């Protein structure tokens, strides 16, 4: 999945993956992580997600990472905020009270760039990546996060043979195989979301399961 694909989607306004409201699973399960207010929370491939505003409103300092400058600018415009913009290496950093978004290639970020993040939140990053990039994503996430950390991860699982991503299917078996060595993986919620996917219904899928995981680094 090349960067140009996502840049073109944002440029054309083809952002069906964007949720205009705060994710209900985030609101329901975030407290399971027991993250102390004031901690830094990484949100990879954040887009203009309202979930960042919710996390900031709970007292966390949000550290977003996003490829599309258009997405970042729209986020702050819709919040009615004028961010302070600086250049940090290959990144343009947009900052406002309670949030900073690093605009550039997520895989070029370093732990030094983002500081000590006690937790991460991923609703749209892992499922945005095809299978050949997901393992690299996990490895880079582990390089960014400290040893004592946790995360809330939301994925989808469906018959990938019937429907091309994105969003891509992330089988539970794959997740446990790749992540269980360094993380305690606990499924805390989930539901069949096929009824809300016009593409899935048209493709003849029987299910499109959403899985919600709490991850604790071990």
From Swiss-Prot:
EC number, UniProt record: 2.1.1.67
Example of a GO biological process term: response to tellurium ion
Catalyzed reaction equations: S-adenosyl-L-methionine + a thiopurine = S-adenosyl-L-homocysteine + a thiopurine S-methylether
Subcellular location: Cytoplasm
Enzyme class: transferase
Family statement: Belongs to the class I-like SAM-binding methyltransferase superfamily. TPMT family.
One Gene Ontology term, aspect cellular component: cytoplasm
Record's keyword terms, sorted: Cytoplasm, Methyltransferase, S-adenosyl-L-methionine, Tellurium resistance, Transferase
Organism: Pseudomonas syringae pv. pisi
Sequence positions that bind S-adenosyl-L-methionine: 10, 45, 66, 123
Name of protein: Thiopurine S-methyltransferase
Reported function: Involved in the biological cycling of tellurium and selenium. Tellurium resistance (Ter) mechanism.
Domain of life: Bacteria
Organism phylogeny: Bacteria, Pseudomonadati, Pseudomonadota, Gammaproteobacteria, Pseudomonadales
Molecular-function GO terms, alphabetical: thiopurine S-methyltransferase activity
């Amino acid at each position: 999945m090349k960067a140009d694909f996502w840049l073109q989607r944002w440029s054309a306004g083809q952002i069906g993956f964007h949720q205009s409201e705060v994710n209900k699973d985030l609101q329901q399960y975030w407290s399971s992580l027991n993250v102390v207010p004031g901690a830094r929370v990484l949100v990879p491939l954040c887009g203009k997600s309202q979930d960042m505003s919710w996390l900031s409103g709970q007292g966390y300092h949000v550290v977003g990472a996003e490829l599309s400058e258009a997405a970042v600018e729209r986020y702050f415009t819709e919040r009615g905020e004028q961010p302070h913009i600086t250049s940090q290496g290959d990144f343009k950093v947009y900052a406002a009270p309670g949030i900073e978004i690093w605009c550039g290639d997520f895989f070029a970020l370093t732990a030094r760039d983002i500081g000590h993040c006690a937790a991460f939140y991923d609703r749209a990053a892992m499922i945005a990546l095809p299978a050949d990039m997901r393992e690299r994503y996990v490895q880079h996430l582990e390089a960014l996060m400290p040893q004592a950390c946790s995360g809330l991860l939301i994925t989808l699982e469906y018959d990938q043979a019937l429907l091309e991503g994105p969003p891509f299917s992330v089988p539970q078996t794959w997740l446990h195989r790749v992540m269980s060595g360094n993380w305690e993986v606990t499924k805390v919620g989930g539901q069949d979301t096929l009824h809300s996917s016009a593409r899935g219904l048209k493709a003849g899928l029987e299910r499109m399961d959403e899985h919600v995981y709490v991850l604790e680094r071990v």
